Regions:
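Extended amphipathic alpha-helical segments enriched in small hydrophobics
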Residues: 56-120, 127-143
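Structured core elements
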Residues: 6, 21-23, 104, 182, ...
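Active-site lining segments that contact anionic ligands and/or coordinate catalytic metals
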Residues: 19, 39, 68, 123, ...
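Helix-rich, typically C-terminal accessory recognition domains appended to large enzymatic cores
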Residues: 143-151
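Tryptophan-centric aromatic hotspots in well-structured domains and transmembrane helices
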Residues: 19, 23, 42-44, 107-110, ...
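Glycine-rich phosphate/cofactor-binding loops in nucleotide/flavin-utilizing enzymes
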Residues: 41-57, 151-220
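FAD-binding core of flavoproteins
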Residues: 1-76, 80, 202, 206-220
Length: 220
């Protein structure tokens, strides 16, 4: 609704449009709508991004845990070659791997929560958490597809007793197929995995900043 700002939704492979491209042409902001001081927009944006990336991480991990229990329930009901999937050593190994990774993510989220309770800002550490949980979500959904096989690709028509419907990361009721496709978005929104690696390298590890057009003469 802001004059000079055009928002164009991007159709995703999930069929929805949570991502958009934004064009600003001669857009001006009233002084009363200015947040902070003039010229401090980037610093303010970085602060809000820190909270976005790390502040809600525990809620995300709780969502992944719920999805995991849905997966275990489906595996108990599904059969392959006449035997419940849960009895397959390979399937049990994969479920154990997911759970172990999930516990790592939970402790990462608790670390951020402890910082917030102390009144501290997540800072660049939020990038560590965001990179970790978004890449985990992708691995989780890939492994879920390996375990469920063709059942994991169904978008409708699955027998209700298979419990394939889950709450996706965006809070919608979906399917394992939808969740698998949506997991790719996690490594893009709130800053892509590549951006998080840059933040971690520059602000946590102290590595040289990469070359940019507005950083003439800075070595890679």
């Amino acid at each position: 609704r802001q004059p000079g700002v055009e928002v164009r939704p991007l159709k995703q492979m999930t069929g929805s449009s949570e991502f958009c491209e934004v064009f600003m042409t001669g857009a001006r902001v009233e002084k009363d709508n200015l947040i902070g001081r003039l010229g401090e927009g980037w610093a303010i944006a970085n602060t809000t991004l820190g909270y976005e990336r790390g502040g809600r991480s525990l809620a995300r991990i709780s969502g992944y845990a719920s999805q995991y229990h849905h997966l275990v329930g489906a595996v108990r009901r599904l059969k392959r070659h006449g035997q419940p999937l849960i009895e397959s050593p390979l399937v049990r190994q994969k479920l154990g791997k997911i759970w172990a990774d999930l516990e790592v993510e939970r402790y990462n989220a608790l670390r951020v929560l402890t910082q917030l309770e102390k009144g501290e800002h997540p800072g660049a550490g939020g990038s560590l958490t965001k990179l970790s949980y978004s890449e985990f979500e992708k691995r989780f959904m890939e492994m879920a597809q390996e375990i469920l096989g063709p059942y994991g690709q169904l978008t409708d028509g699955a027998p209700p007793e298979l419990a394939l419907e889950i709450d996706t990361a965006v809070g919608d009721q979906g399917t394992w197929a939808y969740a698998f496709l949506w997991s790719r978005a996690g490594t893009i929104y709130a800053g892509s995995s590549e951006i998080q690696k840059n933040v971690i390298g520059e602000r946590i590890l102290g590595l040289p900043k990469e070359s940019r057009a507005d950083r003439a003469g800075v070595a890679r």
